[in-house]
Amino acid sequence: MAPAVLTAIPNRMSLRSLKWSLLLLSLLSFLVIWYLSLPHYNVIERVNWMYFYEYEPIYRQDFQFTLREHSNCSQQNPFLVILVTSRPSDVKARQAIRVTWGEKKTWWGHEVLTFFLLGQEAEREDKVLALSLEDEHALYGDIIRQDFLDTYNNLTLKTIMAFRWVIEFCPNAKYVMKTDTDVFINTGNLVKYLLNLNHSEKFFTGYPLIENYSYRGFFHKNHISYQEYPFKVFPPYCSGLGYIMSGDLVPKIYEMMGHVKPIKFEDVYVGICLNLLKVDIHIPEDTNLFFLFRIHLDVCQLRRVIAAHGFSSKEIITFWQVMLRNTTCHY
């Protein structure tokens, strides 16, 4: 009996090896076929930003506002307006911001307003969810929504909506910031930073990304096609985690948006518009003001930052409470 058992074991191992070999061969064949089926484009090394420009404003978006803020911002002169991109389902994230960095409306006598940017639910809306969003807006009055689909690829439409809203309904804002729900904002630090600026016109800053390469790989979220963006390098731009601009730039950028076809990445899109307008990005001297990647921050670091990306709603609440403690920092 022993020889039979010994013979069976190698046979099973051989069968298993054969299965793995066939699987790997199939995968390799699929990748080869997929690669050969792709249209091949020559990546353009030298960037010509006029490639994106149309003389007539044929890209002006005409989506309708279906929800708007309760406060009459057009009759106010806010020092800073913070516009936060959000999904309809991000109820907890919006509430976390309302009770932390977006709660206080006045900093050292300067008015700061926070609003949320949404599109329509991409899938068929559950009636309970739709009603809860309407109720949420009725309660807080801080939701701005247009009738385009709320999807990742439509983030640029949200940004265009933000610029249009400022022009039409809040034109007196001295500064405007666009950010996301997973970003921790040290609002007090942000206001101090803006108050200490030497100039307040044609100002644009954030986490600068210079000589950032366009990605053509498998990861869909970061991929951009050659048809949409044929150049190897993106323009200088600020990460969408949080960029800040002076109020005078908002109508200039929005006007340019009507001449530039939207692309997948809203922050890159704004960067293209800035380059066409010949507006330089202000690079902060302190490199610890904006954090693009998720990092561990202690209470003293939190007090120094302006914006840090990659946090849950629960973490934002916890970090805000920690930051407000009477802890002495020696650096």
UniProtKB/Swiss-Prot annotation:
Its cofactor is Mg(2+). GO terms for molecular function: galactosylgalactosylglucosylceramide beta-D-acetylgalactosaminyltransferase activity; N-acetyl-beta-D-glucosaminide beta-(1,3)-galactosyltransferase activity. Pfam families: Galactosyl_T. Pathway: Protein modification; protein glycosylation. Its EC number is 2.4.1.79. The keyword Zinc-finger does not apply. Keywords: Glycoprotein, Glycosyltransferase, Golgi apparatus, Lipid metabolism, Magnesium, Membrane, Signal-anchor, Transferase, Transmembrane, Transmembrane helix. It is a single-pass type II membrane protein. Residues 44-331 are lumenal. The chain crosses the membrane at residues 21-43. Its main location: Golgi. Glycans are attached at N72, N154, N198, N212, N326. It is an enzyme of class 2 (transferase). It is found in: Golgi apparatus membrane. The keyword Membrane applies. Transfers N-acetylgalactosamine onto globotriaosylceramide. Plays a critical role in preimplantation stage embryonic development. Belongs to the glycosyltransferase 31 family. This is UDP-GalNAc:beta-1,3-N-acetylgalactosaminyltransferase 1. It comes from Rattus norvegicus.
